[in-house]
Design a protein with these regions (language model features):
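A residue-level marker of the well-folded mature domains of exported/periplasmic proteins
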Residues: 1-114
């Protein structure tokens, strides 16, 4: 609230971690709810990291412009085989890319991959 009040011309907000959305979803809704029309028109853009829990519901409600999330299932699935390959002296990709999920209000029902 202080940042928004001190910067009335602010037109974008980047959240570099999902905790404000999934750790405190109601305060987030209270803060950005009054900006919903500006967010919908892209007059005010909110980008946030992660695509878990309440974040997806918040995107569905139009209170965030875009979410970019890691794929923890893929990380857990690939990690053992990569570790075994390393132990066996085999080459592994560097980095090992597990993909990202990119969600907007329009894609929220289909954007999350396993």
């Amino acid at each position: 609230t202080d940042i928004l009040a001190a910067n009335p011309k602010l037109d974008a907000f980047g959240i570099m971690g999902g905790w404000p959305l999934f750790g405190a979803p109601q305060p987030y809704r209270d803060l950005f709810g009054p900006l919903k029309d500006r967010i919908a028109s892209n007059d005010f853009v909110v980008g946030a990291a992660d695509t878990i829990g309440d974040e997806v519901a918040i995107a569905r409600d139009g209170l965030v412009t875009a979410l970019v999330g890691q794929r923890p299932f893929e990380m857990g699935y690939k990690a053992p085989s990569v570790m075994i390959d390393l132990v066996e002296g085999k080459a592994v990709a560097d980095p090992v890319f597990t993909g990202l999920d990119e969600c907007t209000k329009d894609t929220v029902d289909t954007c999350i991959q396993k």
